[in-house]
Amino acid sequence: MDIRAAEISAILKDQIKNFGQEAEVTEVGQVLSVGDGIARVYGLDNVQAGEMVEFENGTRGMALNLETDNVGVVIFGADREIKEGQTVKRTRSIVDTPVGKGLLGRVVDALGNPIDGKGPIQATERKRVDVKAPGIIPRKSVNEPMATGLKAIDALIPVGRGQRELIIGDRQTGKTAIALDTILNQKPLNVEGAPEGQKLYCVYVAVGQKRSTVAQFVKVLEEQGALEYSIVVAATASDPAPMQYIAPFTGCTMGEYFRDNGMHAVIIYDDLSKQAVAYRQMSLLLRRPPGREAYPGDVFYLHSRLLERAAKLNDDHGAGSLTALPVIETQANDVSAYIPTNVISITDGQIFLETDLFFQGIRPAVNVGLSVSRVGSSAQTKAMKKVAGKIKGELAQYREMAAFAQFGSDLDASTQRLLNRGARLTELLKQPQFSPLKMEEQVVVIYAGVNGYLDALPVAKVRAFEDGLLSLLRGKEVGILDAIRTSRDLSDDTAAKLKAVVESYAKTFA
């Protein structure tokens, strides 16, 4: 075989010409020690706080403690495969998550990876999970209602778009039920072809809950047709503490996409006490100094920087909004514990749920006396303002009188009348789960209550009266509901028609 020297030199020259000098430079460290979801890493001198790092087996982590001789890394996953002496790579990116409409209808983990078996996420954009909240200039005061569909809340403790309203109570008092009903109530707003300014997308963040509970929640959303406008972020009880810590920030970033693009979203953190516990665990393992109840000193900042990201933006910034409904679980109704007082002071009001009321059959078990909305009637329609102003005062008087009435048996007629009305209004505010009411339906029901049409009825008949009145108004007298819905007001003309209908119905009902 004849090989010519010229050919060989040509081939060699060709090979040398195509030889690239691009060498990939990555900063690499070594694991000094690992355990309890925390790794101490040596050699990552230029790593940023909050930067994502990658271990040899592909597990991700986040650099939290930057010390002189090592870096404390929290691990987003199992630490079993990570051994002392293994290498750790910098990724040069701060922890981020996919955002956009491609996430709607999906269930993701705390880093935005799908866990529902429906294939990869169709999202083109990624955003950092921990960003600064909007400043003072882009904001606008809350001025439009975020209807929950629950009479007790929409009438007495109204929530507006862009507000932060805390749902607080002991375990098993119906906190998640309120959140679920709120999501289901947005279905009429999110119909196909509705204007973006009307729609309200929902993000539900489950922190430290049982997997079965989250699966049940998702199943209900799917059955009721609410999953298509919702995103579920799940960091369950079996997930490592860093995942439970980061999940609310991930969900918030997904909600912010809608807020910043002139749309509206509501985010439910269920619940933040479990996030605080996860953060306490991480902080203590990172050897940060403990404070009250062994929580780290910056646990207030943890929640305030998260909840400040919920805002109503002004027209120059797209007029979008992000409403936050954080949930806090108390122990034995103790609202004065560390985390509950922190979150109460950060939010714009709280819905306080009580075990005693729950077991008395008053559900939703809202304690109307202790619950407040610091946004108030600016988050209500004119129609609701007209009827709800009375019910607040009457219930306050009723609570005061009921306390005294226990001692005296001979009550004068006016006190007796007040107690009767209060008992019926309390009955009127009860509502079964999965049956949210539209704003105009709530208005007519409360109108009947505050104007004394229930006073002659036995308390047990109040529910039947309400159902009958609503079916009459949805059927023959649908014009009244339409008038209230379109004008968002209870005009004198509509009020007169409504009065006539309620009066004639009350006569036939009795």
From Swiss-Prot:
GO terms for cellular component: plasma membrane; proton-transporting ATP synthase complex. Gene3D superfamilies: 2.40.30.20, ATP synthase alpha/beta chain, C-terminal domain (1.20.150.20), P-loop containing nucleotide triphosphate hydrolases (3.40.50.300). One of its GO terms (molecular function) is ATP binding. ATP binds at residues 169-176. It is found in: Cell inner membrane. Keywords: ATP synthesis, ATP-binding, Cell inner membrane, Cell membrane, CF(1), Hydrogen ion transport, Ion transport, Membrane, Nucleotide-binding, Translocase, Transport. It catalyses: ATP + H2O + 4 H(+)(in) = ADP + phosphate + 5 H(+)(out). It is an enzyme of class 7 (translocase). Its main location: membrane. InterPro entries: ATP_synth_asu-like_sf (IPR023366), ATP_synth_asu_C (IPR000793), ATP_synth_asu_C_sf (IPR038376), ATP_synth_F1_a_nt-bd_dom (IPR033732), ATP_synth_F1_asu (IPR005294), ATPase_a/bsu_AS (IPR020003), ATPase_F1/V1/A1_a/bsu_N (IPR004100), ATPase_F1/V1/A1_a/bsu_N_sf (IPR036121). Its EC number is 7.1.2.2. The record marks 371 as: Required for activity. It is a peripheral membrane protein. Produces ATP from ADP in the presence of a proton gradient across the membrane. The alpha chain is a regulatory subunit. F-type ATPases have 2 components, CF(1) - the catalytic core - and CF(0) - the membrane proton channel. CF(1) has five subunits: alpha(3), beta(3), gamma(1), delta(1), epsilon(1). CF(0) has four main subunits: a(1), b(1), b'(1) and c(9-12). Belongs to the ATPase alpha/beta chains family. This is ATP synthase subunit alpha. The lineage of its organism: Bacteria, Pseudomonadati, Pseudomonadota, Alphaproteobacteria, Hyphomicrobiales.
